[in-house]
């Protein structure tokens, strides 16, 4: 594949580095210790097709990457009350790139205690950590 004739102001690596500097990573081992903790919310930001295909961390809240900022903002008509002050949030995606970027944005929005799962869900599964199935919406029949 040939390289395009232009340069971006910031490339993906720069964006990831900037986001990582604003947030904290958490290992799969340390994250597993937080499972079931009332003050910690696991947030799966993967596409719904990934959840259907690969499962998810048991008890995680699914917030699609494209809606996350809207669901976090209490001034948005899309706000979800799972996002409240005083809780820790562990964001994850497949490999940790989207989660790192998302965690950086949430930190910019003023949220604290935001973590991204190092290595993402792939690392979580590879280490033999618990995996559950995506809960189906009560409004849609199972296929």
Which ranges hold each PLM region?
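Short, surface-exposed ligand- or partner-binding patches at beta-edge/loop junctions that are enriched
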Residues: 92
């Amino acid at each position: 594949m040939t390289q395009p004739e232009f340069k971006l102001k910031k490339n993906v690596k720069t964006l990831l580095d900037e986001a990582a500097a604003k947030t904290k990573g958490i290992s799969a081992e340390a994250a597993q210790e937080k499972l079931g903790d009332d003050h910690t919310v696991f947030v799966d930001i993967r596409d719904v097709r990934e959840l259907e295909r690969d499962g998810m961390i048991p008890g995680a809240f699914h917030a699609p990457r494209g809606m996350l900022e809207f669901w976090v903002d209490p001034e948005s008509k899309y706000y979800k009350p799972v996002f409240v002050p005083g809780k820790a949030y562990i964001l994850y995606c497949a490999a940790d790139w989207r989660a790192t970027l998302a965690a950086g944005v949430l930190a910019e929005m003023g949220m604290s205690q935001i973590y991204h799962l190092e290595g993402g869900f792939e690392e979580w599964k590879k280490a033999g950590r618990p995996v559950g199935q995506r809960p189906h919406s009560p409004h849609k029949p199972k296929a």
